[in-house]
């Protein structure tokens, strides 16, 4: 079995003094050799980290001793290598960003469905199955017959519901996401909008892949994950996808053979989305990454874009999305 344990966790709970948890949690992670990112907000905790079996157990034991953070349910998968470069504990307004005020999964939330009961639910012809993840995640794997809202970010999901779903028409709705957290808010939002029967997969796709045998699965493809593995297969081992470090899209080995693919600079998904100035920054970043690797060092540029580059990328992608919307309306 792979030696690195990758642990995804979250819990919605009132943490009025969440700021005071950042430093001791950061120290706990560092002392136990754990890397990855955890988010803290007044509404709870969320994130994915990785480390040894002993390190992850020590972190979970520490969390269990903190008021409100006991009994956190986590999902585990495995990797041969450490999938993160750094250790970060961040303070946020939300632990998963939907951008709708007043949505509180602690107060209102959909009906949880265990992985063992999920197949029966989504096989019901009266159930509308909705994938709440982003379009680039859905492209590499989803459940059979699932609806893809084709959102670029979770913030776009409420608009999708308003424009495409109707409580009077869609009587039963089942939803799923990677680990379950997005469905906590999406189901709460839909109930607030008047939908009566709203279900979601308890523990998300990761828990389903862990518990449901391959011969019974209704999952098709691989599951996108937000770390260096890019995707995991049904065995929760590293999948077949790589990632373009310019636009962060998952790419296949076949797509890497394209003339548009330049490692760290561009791929078939983003070849027309960046300026020459941005490409030059990507080229320099990739040069630094390769130089660090040749020295046996790590370079954080391989993990994330700088804050400025990320902001510019988001603006470029938003412009592209708006262009597609205009074209669709014109047609």
Swiss-Prot record:
Function: Catalyzes oxygen-dependent 5-hydroxyuridine (ho5U) modification at position 34 in tRNAs.
Organism in which the protein naturally occurs: Marinomonas sp. (strain MWYL1)
Enzyme class: oxidoreductase
Catalyzed chemical reaction(s): uridine(34) in tRNA + AH2 + O2 = 5-hydroxyuridine(34) in tRNA + A + H2O
EC numbers for this chain: 1.14.-.-
Protein name listed in UniProt: tRNA uridine(34) hydroxylase
GO terms of molecular function: oxidoreductase activity, acting on paired donors, with incorporation or reduction of molecular oxygen
Active site residues according to the UniProt entry: 177
Keyword tRNA processing appears in the UniProt entry: yes
Superkingdom as given in the UniProt entry: Bacteria
């Amino acid at each position: 079995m792979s030696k690195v344990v990758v642990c995804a966790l979250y819990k919605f709970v009132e943490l009025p003094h969440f700021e005071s948890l950042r430093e001791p949690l950061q120290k706990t992670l560092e002392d136990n050799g754990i890397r990855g990112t955890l988010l803290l907000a007044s509404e709870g905790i969320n994130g994915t980290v990785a480390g040894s079996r002993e390190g992850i157990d020590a972190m979970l034991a520490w969390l269990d001793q903190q008021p409100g953070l006991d009994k956190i349910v986590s999902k585990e998968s495995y990797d041969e290598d450490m999938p993160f470069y750094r250790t970060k504990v961040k303070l946020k307004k939300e632990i998963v960003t939907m951008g709708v005020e007043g949505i509180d999964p602690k107060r209102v939330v959909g009906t949880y469905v265990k992985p063992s009961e999920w197949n029966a639910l989504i096989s019901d012809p009266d159930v509308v199955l909705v994938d709440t993840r982003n379009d680039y995640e859905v492209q590499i794997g989803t459940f059979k017959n699932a609806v893809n809202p084709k959102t670029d970010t979770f913030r776009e999901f409420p608009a999708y519901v308003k424009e495409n779903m109707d409580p009077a028409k869609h009587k039963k709705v089942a939803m799923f996401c990677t680990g379950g957290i997005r469905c906590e808010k999406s189901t709460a939002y839909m109930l607030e909008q008047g939908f009566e029967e709203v279900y979601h997969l308890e523990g998300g796709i990761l828990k389903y892949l862990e518990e449901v045998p391959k011969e019974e699965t209704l999952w098709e493809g691989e599951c996108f994950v937000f770390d260096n593995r890019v995707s995991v297969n049904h065995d929760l081992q590293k999948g077949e996808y790589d990632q373009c470090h310019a636009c962060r899209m998952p790419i296949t080995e076949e797509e890497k053979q394209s003339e548009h693919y330049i490692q760290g600079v561009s791929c078939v998904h983003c070849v027309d989305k960046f300026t020459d100035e941005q490409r030059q920054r990507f080229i320099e970043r990739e040069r630094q990454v390769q130089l660090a690797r040749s020295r046996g060092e790590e370079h954080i540029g391989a993990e994330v874009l700088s804050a400025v580059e990320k902001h510019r990328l988001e603006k470029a992608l938003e412009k592209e999305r708006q262009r597609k919307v205009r074209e669709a309306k014109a047609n």
